[in-house]
Amino acid sequence: FIHHIFRGIVHAGRSIGRFLTG
């Protein structure tokens, strides 16, 4: 359960970073 949440956070972080870098 915790691992799933952590993976979700990491994925969200990458998505945000990718969006900011365009």
Curated annotation (Swiss-Prot):
Transmembrane segments: none annotated. The modification Glycine amide is found at G22. It holds the Pfam family Antimicrobial12. Mast cells in gill, skin and gut, and in lining blood vessels in the viscera. GO terms for cellular component: extracellular region; membrane. The keyword Transcription regulation does not apply. It is a peripheral membrane protein. GO terms for biological process: defense response to bacterium; innate immune response; killing of cells of another organism; regulation of defense response to virus. It is found in: Secreted; Membrane. It comes from the Eukaryota. Antimicrobial peptide with broad-spectrum activity against Gram-positive and Gram-negative bacteria. Rapidly inactivates both channel catfish herpesvirus (ED(50)=11 uM) and frog virus 3 (ED(50)=16 uM) over a wide temperature range. Has hemolytic activity. Belongs to the pleurocidin family. This is Piscidin-3. It comes from Morone chrysops x Morone saxatilis.
